[in-house]
Amino acid sequence: MNNKGRTPGSAGRTVRSSAQQNGLTMRKRDMTPTRNTNLLPNATFVGDRFLGVRLDQDELDHANHLMTSKLYSNKENLNNSMSEPNSPEKKSVEGEALKQMMRHKSTGALTDADDGDRILCYKKNLAPPPAIGYINQAKVLYSTNSVINPASSVKKSTRHVKETATKVLDGPGLTKDLYSRHLDWGCHNWVAVALGHELYLWNTETCVIKNLFEDNAPTNEGLITSVRWSQEGRYISLGYASGAVKIYDPNRPKTTEYVRELRTLRVGGASRCASIAWRKQGVMTCGYKSGDIVNHDVRISQHVVSSWGGDNGHCRDVTALEWSADENMCVSGSSDRTAKIWDGRHVRGSTVIQDPEPMFTIDEHTGQVRTAQFCSFRDGILATGGGINDGTVKLWDVKRQFQKVRELNVCETGGVGGIVFNRPYSEMLTASDDGFLRIYRFNANYKLSHEIQASNEPIMDLVGSPFDEVLIGDMEETLKVFQLFNVDKSTNILDRTAPKNVGLNVR
């Protein structure tokens, strides 16, 4: 037997500890790190963490001076080896490469970070600022500058929208009719509200409320079916179920009954005026139940100057009327599921054509065209909203032969009650029969940015103020004001002061 390498007396025996002899099992304890991998063959070892000690800047400068000094360079060029001689030129090139490598290592490459990661700067001054327009994709881990460029490091947050109504008023007697216009907001911050036969005026700044008729409202014309302020905000026109249209001056003192009524406009055979739109210079456009659209010049006694109807017009109620900002076009929506765009350049004068053909007819809605609006911040964009069984808003480009730009599915359980455009934020607001207000951004995708439940009942009316507030009227007979487009009042160019000498000569 070969007993080489064994101690005397250990041949054929197994050495056991006293604990094993007594039947005890020794608990495995943690072991300290070791370089002997044979003890733990299945273990995975990680290299020791090295903490480098950075020298002072003075010592680094001194070392750099020694490497770049002329004396060091001369010594480096000497050949002191006993092997193959080296030329001074070759040694000089190798020494220069070594110096450049050591210099690079001594100035910032001592970490595992990438070149783009700005971790530490071993200079007395901060790193030089990047060039204008440069987008740095590096991760800024540490910075001594408290001000960071927000364009590259701070994510732009979406604006906050206040989803609760700022003012809520009761509107007893608000007619539950989806195809009548009960509200309008004038340019001098007066809101006109039709409650049955009465008309109330409410100033949203002073909270003053007054009755236009002072409990002597005319009842022989039926219910009020449409309300509209003139463009300069001095006169208000009311359409009635009988087809009559009355013009009032709210600022005129009431000394006798109906003295605030300036005149009444009637058209033979017309009934139920549900839509009114004012132009400049005293021209008022009215839509009737018969489908006819009549242009009235309120400054002259023979007020009917032109009409759009007949075989080229609508065959049912005209429910929406709006003029473009330049007054070259007028859009009308009807219960016959069509919207027509009319040429507004020949409304009055010698060039008037009675019952002309419309410029374009939109017939892609599956329900009544309940609302229509020209975009206030993007020229040439028209929005039409469908009624019951439609629930869509369709956007049209009038400059491209009324090509459809986008179709938005606003409401699946009802129609669209109103459309308001907001210029400061370039957004579109819609109200629908499901009680929701929806804000869409006018970008490439027309993205839905906010959805607000404004009511538990269908919203019948949606109007916007000249100061970026909105007012809704719902079937709960309530009026609610929302501040969805708050802007800095110091930058608001609109003047809230009403001009004193602006008006029309209404005969």
Swiss-Prot record:
Cellular compartment(s): Chromosome; Cytoplasm
Xref: Gene3D superfamilies: YVTN repeat-like/Quinoprotein amine dehydrogenase (2.130.10.10)
Compositionally skewed regions (Polar residues) per UniProt: 15-24, 74-86
Database matches in Pfam families: WD40_CDC20-Fz
Source species, domain of life: Eukaryota
One GO term of the biological process aspect: positive regulation of anaphase-promoting complex-dependent catabolic process
SUPFAM superfamilies linked: WD40 repeat-like
Keywords carried by this UniProt record: Cell cycle, Cell division, Chromosome, Cytoplasm, Meiosis, Mitosis, Repeat, WD repeat
SMART domains: WD40 (SM00320)
One GO CC annotation: cytoplasm
Disruption phenotype: RNAi-mediated knockdown causes embryonic lethality. Embryos are arrested at the metaphase-anaphase transition of meiosis I and lack formation of polar bodies. In addition, causes a loss of asymmetric cell division and par-2 mislocalization in the one-cell embryo followed by an arrest at the one-cell stage.
Ranges of the WD repeats in the UniProt entry: 219-258, 313-352, 364-406, 411-450
Mutation effect (D433N): In h1983; reduction in the number of eggs laid
Residue numbers spanned by region Disordered: 1-39, 74-95
Primary localization: nucleus
Entry's Gene Ontology molecular function annotations: anaphase-promoting complex binding; ubiquitin ligase activator activity
Function: Plays a role in metaphase-anaphase transition during meiosis I. Required for embryonic anterior-posterior axis formation.
Family: Belongs to the WD repeat CDC20/Fizzy family.
Protein name from the UniProt record: WD repeat-containing protein fzy-1
Source species: Caenorhabditis elegans
